[in-house]
Amino acid sequence: TIAARLTRAKQAIARSGERFSWPGTEDRAERLGAALTTIYGVYTLGHTAVAGSDLIDSRLSGLAILLARSIVAEYPGDTEALGLLALIELGEARGAARTTLDGMPLTLAEVDRSVWGRRRIRRGLELAALALPGGGRFALQAGIAGLHSSAATWAETDWGAISTLYHGLSRVWPAPVVILGGIIARSHLGPSELDRAAVELRRLSGRASAEFNRRVFAALADVEERRGEEGLASEALAAASLGEKNEALLRYYARVSERLARRAR
């Protein structure tokens, strides 16, 4: 367990005779980037649980927002700290609508936006506005989350602006997940971009971890369904399900699979 690991770590430190002191202001500033990345990682694990029956691990997402707020309290003028807090606030504001009452995940196109926490969204947008001039990784991610949160309906989503922010994000943080997000955003810009997305997603698969590949295939399933290719969508969905341990996601994939099977008849 985590408690046992902490106990062993404390015992090892005690045996070593090492002494640790609280870092000074300059040292803390130098470590800020690593701290923000760690908090983001914690939030990501909470946003979609690695395993279990629930889509969300609220313990981890709650811890992440607590840590992000404490960092902003320490560094109120740091645009990346503000961006990370904005990103988490906006995500949490939409959290209650991400599943049905029985825990079935919903897409952004399906959610009831009236359930979103509007006060929290306003706070997140204010933080994002302060962060965006910095042009950093978390600031740009907050901008993307802000555009999603500002759309009154799915149809009103500004995919052009979101695609532009993803392009900027790929320049400062060219991670596979950013490339994936950019492809998904562009796929909503018209039929030619939708066809292009199908090709790009297949090219992207296999470039990172098994967990990431499952996300790629889930996106590909959506793209192929929108293209009217139910058979290809079903194949992609099967690949997305392979090795998935989050039971809520598996229930969602089963629901989509049933829908595809009905359409293919």
What are these model-derived regions, one by one?
Residues 108-114, 133, 137-218:
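Alpha-helical adaptor scaffolds
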Residues 64, 71, 93, 131, ...:
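Alpha-helical solenoid scaffolds that mediate protein-protein interactions
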Residues 88, 95, 149-151, 185-189, ...:
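TPR/TPR-like alpha-solenoid repeats
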Residues 206-265:
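C-terminal non-catalytic interaction modules
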Residues 84, 88-91, 141, 145, ...:
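"A position-specific structural signal for the A-helix of alpha-solenoid helical repeats
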Residues 4, 79-80, 177, 231, ...:
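Short, solvent-exposed positions on alpha-helices
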Residues 3-167:
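Amphipathic helix-loop-helix modules that constitute alpha-helical solenoid scaffolds
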